[in-house]
Amino acid sequence: MKKRILAAMVTVTMAASLLAGCGKANTENKGYTIGISQFAVHGSLDNCREGFLAGLAEEGIKEGENLTVDYVNAQAEPATASMTASNFVSKKVDMICAIATPSATTAYNATMNTDIPVIYTAVSDPVAAGLAKEDGSSVGNITGTCDALAVGAQLKMIRDILPDATKVGIIYTTSEANSISTVAEYEAVAADYGFEIVTTGVTAMSEVAIAAADMVKKVDCITNLTDNTVVTALQSVLEEANKAGIPVFGSEVEQVKAGCVASMGLEYFELGKQTGKMAAKVLKGEAKASDMQFETITEPSLYVNFAAAEKIGLKLPESYKTDAYESFDEIIAE
């Protein structure tokens, strides 16, 4: 009897072990779930998202195969971004990809007491946003890529196009840390290029058109930041500037396509791809987000729109036809 009981116990133990082993294997081999929180609808952020998925795919993590994507766009509403991050935490996703600074900060706050890593992209100043330390290291289980503007290169380009200009206007959102720090950078170096920076702060997308109508009376041109609220309302800025006959300079290629005259900007698809490769390392257990410094693309590229320049009677340097990384002969409004 004792032998039969012992044999039964061994059998049950082995079965339990096998079941446990199967469960572990399923856990190890199951696909990943990533919650993507994108703050607003505009081309550069869309390109980041597409690049992010492409970067993951190049590392063997492909949507529809071993990756499930839960995508939410906050429509430039901070409260929606915060709710989205909390929902992702409740769903226990494997990772949150946060696109743009407001989404990144809300995701970081929501995951602070969890083990869910956050990978961000299109954050202009991770240090100012509280997502990284001064040396570039992470403040927690979060890392990503930075889209800091090449301010000096942008101002030099504006000077080349507008040799007699003195005042450059910037409209920015007062609640976006990335915009505040970039404005400060413009103000710090503007005199080196013979410019004065004129700023107007807004708190909501509905204020952008009014700010633009007032701004065009005071400046020779407007230069955009990667400000999510203002970029989402870009057509309002362009409408007022075109009526006044002054150029608007973009901060990336999608703004130039949409009607800005030119930009020394980043390629956001490539930025997103770089982010996707960082995310793959974390998902595969090859690195921890907390141990990874944020990364950036250091070299800007020249983008020009000859149709946008012609619309306001502005002649661009002839060399731009060959020097530009990409040029456009039509305006493709978003």
Residue ranges and their predicted role:
Residues 1-33, 58, 62, 334:
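Short, low-complexity disordered leader/linker segments with a strong preference
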Residues 34, 52, 143-190, 293-309:
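An alpha-beta-alpha
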Residues 60-81, 141-142, 187-205:
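Short beta-strand elements in bilobed, periplasmic/extracellular small-molecule ligand-binding domains
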Residues 70, 74-133, 227-249:
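Beta-alpha junction/loop-to-helix N-cap segments that form part of ligand/metal-binding clefts
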Residues 125-167, 266-287:
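Hydrophobic alpha-helical segments within soluble ligand-binding/sensing domains
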